[in-house]
Every structure is written in structure tokens, then in C-alpha cells.
């Protein structure tokens, strides 16, 4: 089964993404994973301002802080490499979700990352339900895969 088009994103490795050894600097990976998630939301139809604080529109009433992240590096990634970032989001419960990212070079897995988010009320900072738009994105992203209720 192929992924929905908003779950597969391309990225070319730039010189500024690399370290003195000429390979991707370790800290780039989680940034790429987050940027891919942001682009995926936009491709799905959710504007950045409707999800993230600091946009030009009204401020969202729900914040989605990252409460856990990790990354694994499997092969060197170098300047000019054309990467595919494949997202595999999963709802964990009504107030949290994880976005797993696979980074592929010529269909070979070269890295992976994980970002776990929890929904909190922007004013009280207490856990709350996911925003409707993000909830719809998660539901649409899981079509074809069985997920627990």
C-alpha cells in the first residue's frame, strides 16, 4: 500500500546540513522530521497558523508540545542526496500522538526519527483532546491500517 501524498516528502541535503566530515550533522534529523510533519499538515489542508502559535491568524487554543523524541542513524547522508521522508503517524490516545519518520535514500532506510506530542490547553497548560484538524489528519493518515479505538 502506498502512502497518502501528504505523508511522503522530498528533501535534498544541503551543504549547511552537514558537518566537517561531510555527512549530515546529527541534530538535523529531528528538525527535518518536524519540518516534514509541518509540510504534511499544510499539504493535507491545515494552515500553520491554525496549528502552531505565533502565526498571523488567531492563536490556537491547543498547544502540541513534543514530550519525547529519538533518532536513529543507519547510513551516512551526504550533500546532494535526494531523500524521501515517509511519515507514519499514530494516535496514542485522545490527547496524544506520535509521528514516526523514515528517511530513505534510493529506497534504503538511512535514518528514522520519532516525535511524540501531547495536546494541552494553551491557557491552563492541562492535557486536553487533540484539535479537530490534527485529529482528522491522524484519521486520514491511518486509513487502511487498523488502529485501536
From Swiss-Prot:
It catalyses: 1,4-dihydroxy-2-naphthoyl-CoA + H2O = 1,4-dihydroxy-2-naphthoate + CoA + H(+). This is 1,4-dihydroxy-2-naphthoyl-CoA hydrolase. InterPro entries: 4-hydroxybenzoyl-CoA_TE, DHNA_CoA_hydrolase, HotDog_dom_sf. Pathway: Cofactor biosynthesis; phylloquinone biosynthesis; Quinol/quinone metabolism; 1,4-dihydroxy-2-naphthoate biosynthesis; 1,4-dihydroxy-2-naphthoate from chorismate: step 7/7. Catalyzes the hydrolysis of 1,4-dihydroxy-2-naphthoyl-CoA (DHNA-CoA) to 1,4-dihydroxy-2-naphthoate (DHNA), a reaction involved in phylloquinone (vitamin K1) biosynthesis. SUPFAM superfamilies: Thioesterase/thiol ester dehydrase-isomerase. The keyword Glycosyltransferase does not apply. The active site is at residue 19. Transmembrane segments: none annotated. Keywords: Hydrolase. Its EC number is 3.1.2.28. GO terms for molecular function: 1,4-dihydroxy-2-naphthoyl-CoA thioesterase activity; fatty acyl-CoA hydrolase activity. One of its GO terms (biological process) is phylloquinone biosynthetic process.
Amino acid at each position: 500500500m502506498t502512502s497518502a501524498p501528504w505523508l511522503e516528502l522530498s528533501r535534498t541535503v544541503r551543504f549547511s546540513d552537514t558537518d566537517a566530515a561531510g555527512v549530515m550533522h546529527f541534530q538535523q534529523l529531528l528538525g527535518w522530521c518536524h519540518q516534514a510533519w509541518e509540510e504534511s499538515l499544510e499539504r493535507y489542508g491545515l494552515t500553520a497558523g491554525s496549528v502552531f502559535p505565533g502565526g498571523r491568524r488567531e492563536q490556537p487554543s491547543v498547544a502540541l508540545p513534543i514530550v519525547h523524541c529519538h533518532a536513529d542513524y543507519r547510513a551516512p547522508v551526504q550533500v546532494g542526496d535526494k531523500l524521501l521522508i515517509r511519515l507514519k503517524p499514530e494516535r496514542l490516545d485522545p490527547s496524544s500522538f506520535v509521528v514516526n519518520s523514515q528517511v530513505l535514500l534510493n529506497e534504503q532506510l538511512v535514518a528514522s526519527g520519532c516525535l511524540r506530542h501531547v495536546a494541552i490547553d494553551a491557557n491552563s497548560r492541562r492535557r486536553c483532546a487533540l484539535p479537530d484538524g490534527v485529529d482528522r489528519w491522524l484519521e486520514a493518515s491511518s486509513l487502511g491500517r487498523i488502529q485501536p479505538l
